[in-house]
């Protein structure tokens, strides 16, 4: 049906991305692009204009400095969204905990973007050329991000407030049993409020975020890739430039 066809096309696209001819490191224009989707209904409704104004648990995503807006009690943010007619699913959850007289805040965020039930058609065609749909199995392609946030007020006066914050983020990406990657990166942000004016700055991937990919194929899968003139991928590193 049409849905399975869409998933099959998605599978071919994903596998194509995983087939570098040799091991190397390179900057990708759209590396870890799932981290740019957004978080929270308010942030998305405002066109992502949250860096200066965010002051709840979702600040771990938009600008960790905004976590200092969470006072007295912990704050939780949850979000679920679906894309491409429900084929891709996006989940977001975050927690902010104020500590030390509301001057410091700890935060944790979890993001997941995934396409589930992708048909694996590597063994659809038998050696004799016949088609065997019983050989088609499903797999998932999922991207995860774990954000550990810290924010602190460095000035808290009636006419001027300044907060700073940072994220340490761990990336995990998995495509069935074929490929997986671990990555690490840092973000930093600042919020300044002076009377009725608010200014926010957010720097992502300030140390350059990397994903270290590893691949695992059975001998049968390698044979199919070889016979169909596809390269067998090996370990590589994907880099995300600061922005």
Which residues does each predicted region cover?
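Short strand-turn segments of transmembrane beta-barrel domains in outer membranes
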Residues: 48-51, 75-85
């Amino acid at each position: 049906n049409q849905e399975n066809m869409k998933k099959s096309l998605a599978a071919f696209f994903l596998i194509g991305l995983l087939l570098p001819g040799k091991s190397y490191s390179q900057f990708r224009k759209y590396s870890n692009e799932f981290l740019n989707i957004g978080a929270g209904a308010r942030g998305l409704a405002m066109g992502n204009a949250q860096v200066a104004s965010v002051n709840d648990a979702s600040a771990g995503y938009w600008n960790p400095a905004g976590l200092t807006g969470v006072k007295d009690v912990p704050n939780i943010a949850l979000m679920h969204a679906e894309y491409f007619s429900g084929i891709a699913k996006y989940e977001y959850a975050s927690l902010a905990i104020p500590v030390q007289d509301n001057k410091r805040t700890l935060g944790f965020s979890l993001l997941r973007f995934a396409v589930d039930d992708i048909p694996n058609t590597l063994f659809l065609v038998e050696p004799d050329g016949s088609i065997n749909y019983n050989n088609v199995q499903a797999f998932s392609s999922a991207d995860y991000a774990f954000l550990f946030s810290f924010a602190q007020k460095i000035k808290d006066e009636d006419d001027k407030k300044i907060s700073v914050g940072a994220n340490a983020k761990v990336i995990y990406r998995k495509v069935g049993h074929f490929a997986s990657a671990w990555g690490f990166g840092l973000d930093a942000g600042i919020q300044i409020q002076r009377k009725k004016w608010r200014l926010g700055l957010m720097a992502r991937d300030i140390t350059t975020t990397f994903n270290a990919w590893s691949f695992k194929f059975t001998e049968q899968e390698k044979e199919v890739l070889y016979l169909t003139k596809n390269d067998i991928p090996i370990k590589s590193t994907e880099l995300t430039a600061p922005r």
